[in-house]
Amino acid sequence: MNFSNGSKSSTFTIAPSGSCIALPPQRGVATSKYAVHASCLQEYLDKEAWKDDTLIIDLRPVSEFSKSRIKGSVNLSLPATLIKRPAFSVARIISNLHDVDDKRDFQNWQEFSSILVCVPAWIANYVTNAEVIGEKFRKESYSGDFGILDLDYSKVSGKYPSVIDNSPVKSKLGALPSARPRLSYSAAQTAPISLSSEGSDYFSRPPPTPNVAGLSLNNFFCPLPENKDNKSSPFGSATVQTPCLHSVPDAFTNPDVATLYQKFLRLQSLEHQRLVSCSDRNSQWSTVDSLSNTSYKKNRYTDIVPYNCTRVHLKRTSPSELDYINASFIKTETSNYIACQGSISRSISDFWHMVWDNVENIGTIVMLGSLFEAGREMCTAYWPSNGIGDKQVYGDYCVKQISEENVDNSRFILRKFEIQNANFPSVKKVHHYQYPNWSDCNSPENVKSMVEFLKYVNNSHGSGNTIVHCSAGVGRTGTFIVLDTILRFPESKLSGFNPSVADSSDVVFQLVDHIRKQRMKMVQTFTQFKYVYDLIDSLQKSQVHFPVLT
């Protein structure tokens, strides 16, 4: 069977994506040079020792896979955001494979002569995910053949019923800790109150009863790091289960949390209404500029991209230059910002291009988080690596580090850079503020330190847009922008502040919705959303007068 070879001599090219992966699939025609005829399945299944020779990966949700599957296939149901992360290696892919027979050892995956992937639907989103998986195998020296079945599962099962196994999975998937995915917390799992909970204490839940029929994986964005010593649970020998809510911070016992959680769900619903039309070029919420064959490769995460209407356009010196960067202009009633993703290696020169275009004499960059978290790269270092006095050239831009100092007992770092454009004689200065102790999808642990950081950035006297980034440029970035804006509000705007007021009168709700209309998923998690209310409440209880920032 002739199809794409994954040896070092072959070249993998990630196909352009269609709609944003976070959305419901948009029907469109996808193509892939790695497509192989599904008719080859019977040929492989007829081989006497095919299980030792061929790996068939099914990308559908576990709940669907458990009902019906290609004979001998294994399931891989993970969010695109996780699959695309550079640090998510083949070893981690292999550790997340779910096998019905639970007998095969996939650790020697290099010995498979062929790897076939079956996608849930033959559209660009899923095909691109499959190609990313193939790219990871190739980079780790896989020398066999890699192919994507040219028919999605529903068409395979209809056209080639002889290769389908319809026997239900009674206890193979989901019932045992070893078969569960790495633990992650979604909003639903950590909801403050379960109104449908039975029993006298809804803050303590027993281990869930396995129910394969209703089992599905959450599209989580923050998986806990893999624990090499105990494959079944990142917490050691304890059974992986939904956590008892007694272990959740005391803030979750606040009666207002249920109200806030419902508000957050309404924000999510409003955003979903916008995102369903993002693949339509004529829509106000179109994101198609970010998913062309050239711009797509400059996105750190495939499901977090800018809207066409607010994206930053790099100033081009020739028509052939690409003007794309994963960044959005954000305007609030008090300030102007640029929210962008953490740089990847191929976009560093674009980042400095954006800085040059959008600051005047002194610019301000705010970096939230560290370069690496739990072994995963969150942002590529985009400044000189050898410290003070070192210079580094990124495309047309020469960046020199002037100074570096730890501030507020090393809670954050201030760096100062000089930038020079090869096409202009002038030099611009940039103040770079890094708040490293703020992890992905979470909120800062110290309210006082966060307020001091905001004040310090406010005193930078930079000109032009304040450039803010974390890793994806939405969660921590959006939270910072909301906090920076609210702390500039006058006292009258926050008078009688109460989370229980209607959404139309809630300044936090309205502000988050406002910036989400300019960049998707801003203030990404419920934890971050609640933190904004907590910070305002803390300041008011301390009788701090607004505006805190001027």
Curated annotation (Swiss-Prot):
Residues 260-539 form the Tyrosine-protein phosphatase domain. Its main location: cytoplasm. It comes from the Eukaryota. It catalyses: O-phospho-L-tyrosyl-[protein] + H2O = L-tyrosyl-[protein] + phosphate. InterPro entries: Prot-tyrosine_phosphatase-like, Protein-Tyr_Phosphatase, PTP_cat, Rhodanese-like_dom, Rhodanese-like_dom_sf, Tyr_Pase_AS, Tyr_Pase_cat, Tyr_Pase_dom. One of its GO terms (molecular function) is MAP kinase tyrosine phosphatase activity. Transmembrane segments: none annotated. It is found in: Cytoplasm. Keywords: Cell cycle, Cell division, Cytoplasm, Hydrolase, Mitosis, Phosphoprotein, Protein phosphatase. GO terms for cellular component: cytoplasm; cytosol; nucleus; protein aggregate center. Its EC number is 3.1.3.48. The keyword Cell cycle applies. The modification Phosphoserine is found at residues 318, 320. The active site is at 470 (phosphocysteine intermediate). GO terms for biological process: cell division; negative regulation of p38MAPK cascade; regulation of p38MAPK cascade; signal transduction. Belongs to the protein-tyrosine phosphatase family. Non-receptor class subfamily. Plays a role in inhibiting the onset of mitosis. Dephosphorylates sty1/spc1 and wis1/spc2/sty2. This is Tyrosine-protein phosphatase 1.
